[in-house]
């Protein structure tokens, strides 16, 4: 298996006389060791049901694949579906399936259950992220009913701060039977099923995103002469207002002197503050949104439309790296660098930006001042860009580059 710019190291996981290996990226959850909560969930599940109790399993929020791939390794006859909203997690799950000689596993991207097309799983299992908001968690706990066969099981682990909330929510559901509730080492495991009188809830459910389970608040934003509306989401940065790095990018957009760009690419858009500012200030003909986080893409698209950007001008590219998978060049690239992905990934992104831009096109990049200094130093040995400007503010910087 070839190395990639996101790779950090390989972890070994020994379980039930099976040794598994997992490639991890430093920007994925639990890249130092296999998560304790994941191990607790697997141990509890296998001790109660054995390794061959379930024939069709859905691993929700699969990360780099520990739960789903381990269950498949222990019982090769079962069918496994795994999904995550993070394209990098999905990529590493696929790599780890290959690394462990596992075939016949469906691994794909989805925001909640939105892109799950089958509804006859006998086990839905998840290590629920600690950053998820309570509406997101309760939506998942309820929506699982629409994807289970009759008598199917939901098995989850949560961090202790969510234990009381989960227990209370499940306890008041008239059609839910809690089969197990166990806690240890800062985590709590729940097993539950929907009873025979669940009725309408066992039908496929509507999209959680469309129902608004991810929304945290609606707000009006004022920054300098810019006014816009936002619906902000849980588990994305800048829920109250644009942060320093977004402000630097918005100021750089205000300072552009060239004619309005025909096509712009916005990467890692978060809640969409910078994307909305670019739309209102520049009125581009097309906006390409690029991110590995599907929630960020959907939220930003929604906020652009909320601020009267026509939906047919927006294109979403859910992928790792900065690019659109098309041959069309863009006039302007704007975004915040993901520093946690590491220096190799950042350098690869700079190369991708050069590939996307037309000659004379500009890139507006924000990051910590340390990261921007490293980028400028690296560009001294390259010939793709002219450094036009750098602005600093409270440990952050914006860098303006022009494509030669």
Question: Model regions: which residues?
Answer:
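N-terminal auxiliary segments of SAM/dcSAM-dependent transferases
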Residues: 1-15, 27-31, 153-219
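A SAM-dependent methyltransferase catalytic signature shared across enzymes that methylate proteins
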Residues: 102, 166-180, 193-198, 375-389, ...
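A short SAM/SAH-binding and catalytic strip from SAM-dependent methyltransferases
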Residues: 122-135, 331-344
